[in-house]
């Protein structure tokens, strides 16, 4: 189902989706067919083999993510847990204080909005779900959560399996 606020243009193997939050473009393989009828987008196959069925599901989901992204945007929230862990946004970069001897500067790619709430919560918004996930993973890779003290950068709602420390010799 295509939202009314979204324009779709399918030419050859190229899909262009325009909406309130931006424009996304993706090239699809020739085995995938796309038809527009009555506000619906139908993704089909030219021949059905096991590998082609997998690609069919993949591209159906990718196109659906494009439709949702340009009409609503995707949001990932990261939480910084640890003493002295802070974040701030400067034009075109995210500055993190993560216990290193220097602040960590991460360049914000085009099409991604970053907002810091209360110094320890980072909201990342984008219409491209793939770019959003890659950027969030890049930020998280600077301090992944560790199981002993529970410090690090976590996705909102993520639970860290805690481990007991070493039991000393007695």
Where are these regions (language model features)?
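N-terminal intrinsically disordered, cationic/polar leader segments
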Residues: 1-68, 72-137, 141, 146-170
């Amino acid at each position: 189902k295509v939202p009314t606020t979204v324009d779709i243009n399918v030419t050859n193997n190229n899909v262009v989706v325009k909406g309130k939050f931006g424009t996304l473009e993706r090239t699809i393989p020739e085995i995938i067919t796309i038809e527009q009828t009555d506000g619906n987008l139908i993704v089909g196959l030219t021949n059905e083999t096991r590998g082609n069925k997998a690609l069919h599901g993949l591209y159906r989901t990718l196109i659906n993510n494009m439709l949702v992204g340009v009409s609503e945007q995707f949001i990932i929230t990261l939480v910084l847990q640890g003493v002295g862990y802070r974040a701030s946004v400067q034009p075109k970069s995210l500055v993190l204080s993560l216990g290193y001897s220097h602040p960590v500067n991460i360049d914000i790619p085009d099409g991604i909005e970053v907002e810091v709430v209360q110094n320890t919560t980072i909201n990342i918004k984008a219409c491209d779900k793939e770019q959003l996930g890659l950027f969030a993973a890049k930020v998280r890779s600077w301090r992944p959560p560790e199981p002993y003290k529970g410090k690090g950068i976590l996705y909102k709602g993520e639970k860290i399996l805690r481990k007991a420390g070493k039991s000393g010799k007695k």
